[in-house]
């Protein structure tokens, strides 16, 4: 193996081990402007997109001890390495896809040491993010509290109203 390929292989191995997960993509009709825009979107969620040769990527997977066989690895192969939350990276891919006529196809992925098919990665991307889930939980907890506060306010205003009416009657 040439020295350049060995260096690239080591670099990809390091990215695989350093990342929280990765997403294998096939890209279609991807221009340089699309690539730049996509990379900028991913940098916001601590992820990066790389175009890699299949042979190099699968060798790096093998030497990193990761077993993965994407259903269909035909075409150009792109990999999103997620150094932060891999679900957020998958969501970015999904959002980008909606804006650019499905130019990216999910082939496979690895999130939290679990290998996923392309369909599974896409399903995970459609789930609410941790931030959204936290907001929903806070909303569920806060809603009954606000109802209790509303009931207490109405009871107190009823008591105050009764006292006011009693005071008016005694003044007459």
Curated annotation (Swiss-Prot):
<dbReference type="InterPro" id="IPR001790">
    <property type="entry name" value="Ribosomal_uL10"/>
</dbReference>
<protein>
    <recommendedName>
        <fullName>Large ribosomal subunit protein uL10</fullName>
    </recommendedName>
</protein>
<keyword id="KW-0689">Ribosomal protein</keyword>
<comment type="similarity">
    <text>Belongs to the universal ribosomal protein uL10 family.</text>
</comment>
<comment type="function">
    <text>Forms part of the ribosomal stalk, playing a central role in the interaction of the ribosome with GTP-bound translation factors.</text>
</comment>
<dbReference type="GO" id="GO:0015934">
    <property type="term" value="C:large ribosomal subunit"/>
</dbReference>
<dbReference type="InterPro" id="IPR043141">
    <property type="entry name" value="Ribosomal_uL10-like_sf"/>
</dbReference>
<comment type="subunit">
    <text>Part of the ribosomal stalk of the 50S ribosomal subunit. The N-terminus interacts with L11 and the large rRNA to form the base of the stalk. The C-terminus forms an elongated spine to which L12 dimers bind in a sequential fashion forming a multimeric L10(L12)X complex.</text>
</comment>
<keyword id="KW-0694">RNA-binding</keyword>
<keyword id="KW-0687">Ribonucleoprotein</keyword>
<dbReference type="GO" id="GO:0070180">
    <property type="term" value="F:large ribosomal subunit rRNA binding"/>
</dbReference>
<dbReference type="InterPro" id="IPR022973">
    <property type="entry name" value="Ribosomal_uL10_bac"/>
</dbReference>
<dbReference type="InterPro" id="IPR002363">
    <property type="entry name" value="Ribosomal_uL10_CS_bac"/>
</dbReference>
<dbReference type="InterPro" id="IPR047865">
    <property type="entry name" value="Ribosomal_uL10_bac_type"/>
</dbReference>
<dbReference type="GO" id="GO:0006412">
    <property type="term" value="P:translation"/>
</dbReference>
<dbReference type="GO" id="GO:0003735">
    <property type="term" value="F:structural constituent of ribosome"/>
</dbReference>
<keyword id="KW-0699">rRNA-binding</keyword>
<dbReference type="Pfam" id="PF00466">
    <property type="entry name" value="Ribosomal_L10"/>
</dbReference>
